[in-house]
Amino acid sequence: MAITKDDILEAVGAMSVMELNDLVKAFEEKFGVSAAAVAVAGPAAAGGAAAAEEQTEFTVTLKSAGANKVGVIKAVREITGLGLKEAKDLVDGAPKPVKEGVDKKTADELVKKLVEAGAEAEAK
């Protein structure tokens, strides 16, 4: 009769800590493995590796409304879907983020739209 997985689990469950320690050492010797925790690679150090990583999400920020505040408020409403008062408050409170988590192409289009309306904007 063969030993089943359940028999092994029952035997291991009945062992003391010292016996389990000896069992682990025996496994290491028999199979040439290590019970040490696997080291997970952390984030790359700042510098060359970080610079090589391309940013995929951008935040479009309104830096200032410029001279054409009404046009900028209209552009902000169009971009965000905010109501008139909320868009005006956002424009009045510049610098403020207008749209977050957008891709590079969308961010560039939104910045262009804000600049055409008379605002000073950037994507980061």
UniProtKB/Swiss-Prot annotation:
InterPro entries: Ribosomal_bL12, Ribosomal_bL12_C, Ribosomal_bL12_C/ClpS-like, Ribosomal_bL12_oligo, Ribosomal_bL12_oligo_N_sf. One of its GO terms (cellular component) is cytosolic large ribosomal subunit. Homodimer. Part of the ribosomal stalk of the 50S ribosomal subunit. Forms a multimeric L10(L12)X complex, where L10 forms an elongated spine to which 2 to 4 L12 dimers bind in a sequential fashion. Binds GTP-bound translation factors. It comes from the Bacteria. Keywords: Ribonucleoprotein, Ribosomal protein. Belongs to the bacterial ribosomal protein bL12 family. This is Large ribosomal subunit protein bL12. Forms part of the ribosomal stalk which helps the ribosome interact with GTP-bound translation factors. Is thus essential for accurate translation.
